[in-house]
Amino acid sequence: KWSGTMCLTEPVCGTDLGMLKTKAVEQSDGTYKISGQKIFITSGDQDLTENIIHLVIARATDSPPGTKGISLFLVPKFIVKEDGSIGPRNGVSTGSVEHKMGIKGSATCVLNFDDAVGYMIGPKNKGLSQMFTMMNLERITVGVQGLGISEIAYQNSVTYAKERKQGKTNNTKSTNGADFIIEHADIRRSLLNM
């Protein structure tokens, strides 16, 4: 019912996360007001799930500069009420949908955090190590996902080649018209090179 995102990259810092500008201001109730902008957020906004939980790295006002002062925050798209039901919209908005080559099925967004309510996860100033613990698993997951997609593409191609008839080959004894395309040498070569 809910989905999640990882919000690291900002317009001012790509790989140098120590330069991030997103701020976290502690409130009297223990929550934080998160303000800043994140870019390249996969599935950053969509209406397929009831809520989106954003994991956001930000710097608390009294934290040191650089990567040693980064904390991790849970920032929901919608505030969750005490009874677990969905409450009002949080201060998270979509600035734009990214226009990157090859992205057609993913709402990769620019997200704006405007005094959004956030909840610190884990110890203060340890957010980067927490985020990268999760990201290390995600790197493996993305690789396995790519392997799965390529495997099903290959299997579907072989199935189709065994069902589709087109033209005649010289190495079959079929007399009833066209041959299955898997009998064609170039199709077999293409399948071997997939």
Where in the sequence are the language-model features?
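A short core secondary-structure module
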Residues: T31, S35-R89
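A glycine-rich, basic-preceded beta-loop-alpha segment at the flavin cofactor/substrate interface
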Residues: F40-T42, I79-G95, K100, A107-E138, ...
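Short Gly/Pro-enriched turn/cap motifs at secondary-structure boundaries
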Residues: V12-T15, D45-D47, P64, K100-S106
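Alpha-helical interface subdomain recognition
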Residues: D16-L17, Q27-S28, N112, I140-M194
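Short beta-strand elements
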Residues: G18-V25, I57, L111, D115
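Beta-sheet entry/capping signal
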Residues: S3-T5, G30-Y32, I53-L55, G69-F73, ...
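Gly/Pro-rich turn-and-neighbor structural signature
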Residues: K1-Y32, I39-F40, H184-M194
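Core alpha/beta catalytic barrel or barrel-like domain that forms the active/cofactor pocket
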Residues: W2-E10, S71-L72, R164-S174
